[in-house]
């Protein structure tokens, strides 16, 4: 066992350390420990290394102690070692990611598993050298669970909520809560609204700790419009002179963003570009599969993409000017062209093959658009070397005469965006990850300078930039707060209501003391404060860090696992009707009825085999209702027996009400099987809208108002929702949201309109 495995943090200290991704970009993997809970954040590989050397330092920690693993997004440096963790180590925790991330994850890693090799020795069986196999990938995939944005889940006392992070489709930042301490893990995030993704969200709840990326350190991005213009102009210039342009990209993420830019530019400049004489290709083994995911999750993208999809009824990711290449055998390399090829780091694959083919010609261009990790060919190429080694035989060098340029479209925050976001979060502890040492060090200095005015105060901000496998221990004083539940809450609500009523009638005693010299008055206000003393049982749930104050009468309802006395109740009532009539009424009221004894076969069901050996009396009927309440009828005497609890008590009360009223019930006097004679006409449009508006009334209560002029049937029917500063205007006649200043609320209203149309209207 190593030092990391042996040391356990003090119960009042939150411990953070990285197995990868600290003071480096690649193999992101971070560990959080607090109150006996352990979770891992991301499980990536280092793109500049191969085999076991590319993994985080998993041998430095006992992975069997991990309760939960959260994956922020599908990029290889954040998710590619997940199958290794799940199948090749003693990890036994649960794994969560968003739905789009899981959809992309398997395809991306299926391709990756073909090139991950531990040994480089020729003649070895590569199937035995891979970090993991296709079978490992399939088995791990089945164990991965998904989480929706803005939903909160709990695993072994660890609560976590997913929020939009921008960056790529499906990327999430997680706000984690353990024993009242909240930690925000941003993963890779972007605060810039691009052509298809929204910017990262600010969680509504504050955080005590933020684990934030520092990829670009203190650098500032050029405005997006300028970068797009430079990109298109540079490519246009090269292809106009007969050159070829290679854009190494990740298979998913920035590739789709750049394709949206180029497809629009090619569409607007057809004549200048020879009406299709300069083709654009997207070369990736996963090209079509990846694009199908983007076409599926259009509704999770920004308003611009959704509007295009809705207005034109065509998917924006079905490109008019871009063709797909699965391999270079299909590629006819004649004349100028633009090639987007993966992988983005140029370490191997299609992008590396094209680089080696095109780099000897001066008229060609390699344009790097993403972040380049130290040690990769993409980073090396930016130094403009005279030659590059062949990927298939490193002893052979290839002259590099092509142009090399960089216009970054990497979806990472710059310094200004990062600082603004950190200030909005307001955490007093900042942990920097995902950045090379120098940019990260500069960012730390800038943050400390920015928050220097808070030094030596209660709100002092601490900034950490630990190296891999170095602990950061943060102390949190344990404040125990009990949560009142059940009847105690009702008593307190009643007391508060009474106090509010009394406050309006309360007289404030004013004592005037006159100063004879100045004739000024002093006023002293005397206020009486009433207090309410409540009593109950304090229940501690150490697993989930909950402390609850529960009334004795509510104890069994809220904490069924506690040992309590079970009471069985029995009541008897005389009947003046046949058991057949009672059985009919019971079946009408309750769907869950099991027949134990039926001597006269009134139920037309077989008797439970367990009771065939028991002595049965003439005309006896015994049934079990809702799984617990037993009703026995024999000789016109009904006996009701049940175990005392909230649900069974309610069921027993209902059954007893039936027994006492069965003789006089209208249905008992006359049971009709005929259909009614009157006509059911189809409801008009106004009635349907009224029914749909009931869905909104249930969801939003008094904040929803429907404007309906029943005298003028041609006037459009509208409704409004007012939630504080957030307002929305809905046109029910057209079933659209006309105005809304909140995207989350707008999405929710659109979903309700669809539900109302599909479910409520057809029933009208």
Curated annotation (Swiss-Prot):
Biological-process GO terms, alphabetical: mRNA processing
* Subcellular location per the Swiss-Prot or TrEMBL entry: Nucleus
Sorted alphabetically, the keyword list is: Endonuclease, Hydrolase, Metal-binding, mRNA processing, Nuclease, Nucleus, Zinc
Which cellular component appears as one GO term in the record?
Answer: mRNA cleavage and polyadenylation specificity factor complex
Tell me the SMART domains matching this sequence: Beta-Casp (SM01027), CPSF73-100_C (SM01098), Lactamase_B (SM00849)
Task: Cite the Gene3D superfamilies for this sequence.
Answer: 3.40.50.10890, Ribonuclease Z/Hydroxyacylglutathione hydrolase-like
Which E.C. number(s) belong to this protein?
Answer: 3.1.27.-
Looking at the Swiss-Prot or TrEMBL record, what is one Pfam family this protein matches?
A: Beta-Casp
Q: Which InterPro entries match?
A: Beta_Casp, CPSF73-100_C, MBL, Metallo-B-lactamas, RibonucZ/Hydroxyglut_hydro, RMMBL
Q: Which residues bind Zn(2+) 1?
A: 73, 75, 167, 188
Is the keyword Metal-binding assigned to this protein? yes
In the record, what terms sit under GO molecular function?
A: 5'-3' RNA exonuclease activity; metal ion binding; RNA binding; RNA endonuclease activity
Q: Which residues form the active site?
A: 412 (proton donor)
Task: Give the top-rank taxon of the lineage listed in the UniProt record for this protein.
Answer: Eukaryota
Q: List the disulfide bonds.
A: none
Positions with a binding annotation for Zn(2+) 2: 77-78, 188, 434
Q: Give the protein's biological function.
A: Component of the cleavage factor I (CF I) involved in pre-mRNA 3'-end processing.
Q: Which family does it belong to?
A: Belongs to the metallo-beta-lactamase superfamily. RNA-metabolizing metallo-beta-lactamase-like family. CPSF2/YSH1 subfamily.
- Protein name (Swiss-Prot/TrEMBL): Endoribonuclease YSH1
Q: What is the lineage of its organism?
A: Eukaryota, Fungi, Dikarya, Ascomycota, Saccharomycotina
């Amino acid at each position: 066992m190593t030092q990391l495995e042996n040391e356990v943090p003090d119960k009042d200290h939150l411990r953070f350390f990285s197995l990868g991704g600290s003071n480096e970009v690649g193999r992101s993997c971070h560990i959080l420990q607090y109150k006996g809970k352990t979770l891992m954040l991301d499980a990536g590989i280092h793109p500049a290394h191969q085999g076991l050397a590319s993994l985080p330092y998993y041998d430095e920690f006992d992975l069997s102690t991990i309760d939960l693993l959260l994956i922020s997004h599908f990029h290889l440096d954040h998710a590619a070692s997940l199958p290794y963790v799940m199948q090749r180590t003693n990890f036994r925790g649960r794994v969560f990611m968003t739905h789009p991330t899981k959809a992309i994850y398997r395809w991306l890693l299926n391709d990756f598993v073909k090139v991950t090799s531990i040994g480089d020795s020729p003649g070895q069986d590569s199937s035995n050298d891979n970090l993991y196999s296709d079978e490992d990938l399939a088995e791990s995939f089945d164990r991965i669970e998904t989480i929706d944005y803005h939903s909160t889940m709990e695993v072994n006392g660890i609560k976590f909520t997913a929020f939009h992070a921008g960056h790529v489709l499906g990327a999430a930042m997680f706000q984690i809560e353990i024993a009242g301490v909240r930690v925000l893990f941003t993963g890779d995030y972007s605060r810039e609204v691009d052509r298809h993704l929204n910017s990262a969200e600010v969680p509504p709840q504050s955080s005590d700790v933020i684990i934030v990326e520092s990829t670009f350190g203190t650098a500032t991005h050029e405005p997006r419009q300028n970068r797009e213009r430079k990109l298109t102009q540079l490519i246009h210039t090269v292809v106009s002179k007969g050159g070829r342009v290679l854009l190494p990209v990740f298979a998913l993420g920035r590739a789709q963003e750049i394709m949206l830019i180029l497809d629009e530019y090619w569409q607007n400049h057809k004549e200048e570009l020879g009406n299709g004489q300069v083709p654009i290709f997207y070369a990736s083994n996963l090209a079509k599969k990846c694009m199908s995911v983007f076409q599926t999750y259009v509704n999770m993208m920004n308003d611009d993409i959704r509007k295009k999809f809705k207005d034109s009824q065509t998917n924006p990711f079905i490109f008019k000017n871009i063709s797909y290449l699965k391999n270079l055998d299909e590629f006819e390399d004649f004349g100028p062209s633009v090639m987007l090829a993966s992988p983005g780091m140029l370490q191997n694959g299609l992008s590396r093959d094209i680089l080696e083919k095109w780099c000897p010609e001066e008229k060609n261009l390699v344009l790097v658009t993403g972040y380049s990790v130290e040690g990769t060919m993409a980073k090396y190429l930016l130094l403009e070397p005279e030659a590059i080694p062949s990927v298939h035989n490193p002893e052979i060098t290839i002259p590099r005469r092509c142009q090399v340029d960089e216009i970054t479209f990497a979806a990472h925050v710059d310094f200004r965006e990062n600082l603004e976001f950190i200030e909005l979060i307001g955490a007093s502890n900042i942990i920097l990850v995902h950045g090379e040492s120098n940019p990260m060090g500069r960012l730390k200095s800038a943050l400390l300078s920015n928050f220097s005015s808070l030094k030596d105060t209660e709100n002092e901000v601490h900034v950490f930039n630990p190296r891999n496998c170095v602990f950061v221990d943060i102390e949190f004083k344990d404040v125990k707060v009990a949560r009142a539940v059940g009847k105690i809450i009702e008593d307190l609500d009643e007391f508060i209501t009474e106090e509010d009523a009394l406050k309006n009638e309360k007289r404030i005693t004013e004592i005037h003391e006159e100063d004879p010299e100045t004739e000024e008055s002093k006023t002293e206000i005397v206020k009486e404060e009433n207090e309410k003393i409540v009593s109950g049982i304090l229940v501690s749930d150490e697993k989930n860090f909950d402390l609850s104050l529960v009334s004795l009468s509510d104890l069994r309802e809220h904490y069924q696992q506690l040992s309590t006395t079970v009471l069985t109740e029995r009541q008897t009532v005389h009947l003046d009707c046949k058991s057949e009539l009672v059985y009919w009424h019971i079946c009408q009221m309750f769907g869950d009825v099991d027949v134990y004894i039926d001597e006269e076969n009134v139920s037309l069901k077989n008797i439970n085999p367990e009771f065939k050996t028991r002595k049965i009396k003439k005309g006896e009927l015994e049934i079990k209702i809702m799984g617990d309440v037993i009703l026995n009828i024999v000789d016109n005497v009904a006996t009701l027996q049940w175990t005392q609890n909230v649900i069974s008590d309610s069921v027993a009360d209902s059954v007893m009400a039936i027994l006492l009223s069965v003789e006089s019930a209208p249905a008992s006097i006359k049971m009709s099987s005929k259909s009614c004679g009157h006509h059911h006409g189809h409801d008009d449009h106004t009635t349907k809208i009224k029914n749909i508006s009931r869905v909104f009334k249930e969801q939003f209560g008094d904040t929803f108002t429907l404007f309906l002029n029943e005298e003028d049937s041609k006037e459009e029917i509208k409704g409004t929702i007012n939630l504080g500063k957030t307002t929305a205007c809905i046109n029910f006649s057209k079933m659209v949201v006309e105005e809304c200043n909140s995207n989350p609320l707008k999405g929710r209203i659109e979903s309700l309109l669809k539900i109302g149309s599909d479910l409520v209207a057809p029933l009208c």
